[in-house]
Amino acid sequence: MKKQDISVKTVVAIGIGAAVFVILGRFVVIPTGFPNTNIETSYAFLALISAIFGPFAGLMTGLVGHAIKDFTTYGSAWWSWVICSGIIGCLYGWIGLKLNLSSGRFSRKSMIYFNIGQIIANIICWALIAPTLDILIYNEPANKVYTQGVISAVLNIISVGIIGTILLKAYASSQIKKGSLRKK
């Protein structure tokens, strides 16, 4: 079995991705009125980075980006949700492996596959794992954190479903389609 190294391109993608995640997470959110629960544009961007660079880049971008966002916003990280940002980034990357965006194609079938995958991933991460970790790590009240989790899952599904799909389509459209160049 050959050891796979992490490329410089992936490391740079993680760094830039985490920085953009922080900026979007701090300054491009829409409050919902429910405590600590916002419409987050950062997860749509995380889906793009993860789909392009893979599960490891998604994992690290989510972990590092969310941790820095929390430290710069609140002074400390809320680790249960930081962990889930890493998990969701990894899952977006895993979904993205089948999309093959670099081919220049993001068909209706690919959009449906991506959105079914992200819906399942968001429900698992935000409605199940994050609240459970909140209870185990921080001894938070179950009714509060599961309500936050379900609201976050729904909002992230909508955000990633709309903004993420647009970003993936735009990225795929910017790629040169295989066989589209012809020699005269």
UniProtKB/Swiss-Prot annotation:
Q: Which keywords annotate this record?
A: Cell membrane, Membrane, Transmembrane, Transmembrane helix
Q: Which Pfam families match?
A: ECF-ribofla_trS
Q: Which organism is it from?
A: Staphylococcus aureus (strain bovine RF122 / ET3-1)
Gene Ontology cellular-component annotations: plasma membrane
Q: Where do transmembrane segments lie in this chain?
A: 11-31, 44-64, 77-97, 111-131, 148-168
Q: Where does it localize?
A: Cell membrane
Q: Which family does it belong to?
A: Belongs to the UPF0397 family.
Bilayer topology reads: Multi-pass membrane protein
The answer to whether keyword Plastid applies is no
Its protein name is UPF0397 protein SAB2561c
Q: What is its main location?
A: membrane
Domain of life, per the record?
Bacteria
SS bond partners: none
Q: Which InterPro entries match?
A: ECF_substrate-spec-like, UPF0397
